[in-house]
Amino acid sequence: MKYLFLLFLLICSCASKQHATVIDSTQVNASPCPEDGDCTFEVLSNQSFSIEKDGIGALYPKVVDGNTIILKFEYKRNDIPNTVDGQYRELVYLELNRDHLEIDLKEDELNNVKALFARLCFCRGQTGYYIINQGQLSIKKLSESQYHLKMRFKIDEVPQVISEIDEVISFK
């Protein structure tokens, strides 16, 4: 019984991280992440995505096996206590050609990497996926396998929390 109580205390004492976590690569620099949530950064190798439309014309990404690299940044706000449907997430997807990782793009050139933003919440009329065509994206080579990604962007269609991504990543 004493061990169950200690286990309960251990589980209850866990706290959320306040910085970005990089999955499938090495984290060196964390993007600014709001204190009220967690941020993750994923490198999806040998994957590709297309931007599809559903039956009502809303956009969504369709991820399939491919020969490109998908970068996925996610901000997930901590759930608000005592609320139903209080979840809130923002995602940014980028697709990179593995043979041409160094890039410097702005505005409509962001279409070259299929820059896609998602706001997922119970926010009537203000949720969904949106093409990013305002901003700048720079990926510079630091070493043989390490790159610095810096992105600033703006979405006019919906409010956004995340407007900047700054990561140093290693491709395996």
Region annotations inferred by a language model:
Residues 5, 62, 85, 128-130, ...:
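Sterically constrained small-residue positions within well-ordered secondary structures
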Residues 11-13:
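C-terminal motif of bacterial Sec signal peptides marking the signal peptidase cleavage site
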Residues 17-125:
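An ectodomain-focused feature that recognizes extracytoplasmic/extracellular
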